[in-house]
UniProtKB/Swiss-Prot annotation:
<feature type="domain" description="sHSP">
    <location>
        <begin position="98"/>
        <end position="204"/>
    </location>
</feature>
<dbReference type="GO" id="GO:0009570">
    <property type="term" value="C:chloroplast stroma"/>
</dbReference>
<keyword id="KW-0809">Transit peptide</keyword>
<keyword id="KW-0934">Plastid</keyword>
<feature type="compositionally biased region" description="Basic and acidic residues">
    <location>
        <begin position="37"/>
        <end position="49"/>
    </location>
</feature>
<comment type="similarity">
    <text>Belongs to the small heat shock protein (HSP20) family.</text>
</comment>
<dbReference type="InterPro" id="IPR044656">
    <property type="entry name" value="HSP14.7/HSP23.5/HSP23.6-like"/>
</dbReference>
<dbReference type="InterPro" id="IPR002068">
    <property type="entry name" value="A-crystallin/Hsp20_dom"/>
</dbReference>
<protein>
    <recommendedName>
        <fullName>Small heat shock protein, chloroplastic</fullName>
    </recommendedName>
</protein>
<dbReference type="Pfam" id="PF00011">
    <property type="entry name" value="HSP20"/>
</dbReference>
<keyword id="KW-0346">Stress response</keyword>
<keyword id="KW-0150">Chloroplast</keyword>
<feature type="region of interest" description="Disordered">
    <location>
        <begin position="34"/>
        <end position="55"/>
    </location>
</feature>
<dbReference type="InterPro" id="IPR008978">
    <property type="entry name" value="HSP20-like_chaperone"/>
</dbReference>
Amino acid sequence: MASMALRRLASRNLVSGGIFRPLSVSRSFNTNAQMGRVDHDHELDDRSNRAPISRRGDFPASFFSDVFDPFRATRSVGQLMNLMDQLMENPFMAASRGSGRAMRRGWDVREDEEALELKVDMPGLAKEDVKVSVEDNTLIIKSEAEKETEEEEQRRRYSSRIELTPNLYKIDGIKAEMKNGVLKVTVPKIKEEEKKDVFQVMVD
């Protein structure tokens, strides 16, 4: 009886040591693998969640369209300058358009203490096709030439409106020049001595 009890006890120890232990190891391995997958998926989720936020923060949805058509809506001079700053701060824009060379914007705007200067590429247009005017402190640039096909008409029609800060620019001193398909508009600024913020009133 004692020998049979010892054999049963030994058999139980073998079962617990030989069968359940590998199962325990197997469960531990599967758990680690599952946790590894969860961590990996979580990392992917984090990257996927972070990427759109970063892109939205650095580049608004209209950014790429603004680069090539900044005048599709009425804009202020400040908005144009901010757009230029964005382009200068992000030189990889050319690569994002599939070109290794510097991206040609087709437009440029500069401002200093003397004047505001705007350049716009208008290939295929002559100075007779371009009209520049100012209405209610808004600089209006329009161009349209006679075309033979509808495709050309769409490509060679241009219209823009730029709001000018009141009492800052000399409206009657604006100059426009069309040369080699490039329109250059210069808007001089009012000098301090020319400003008429103070009026002397004669006392009778």
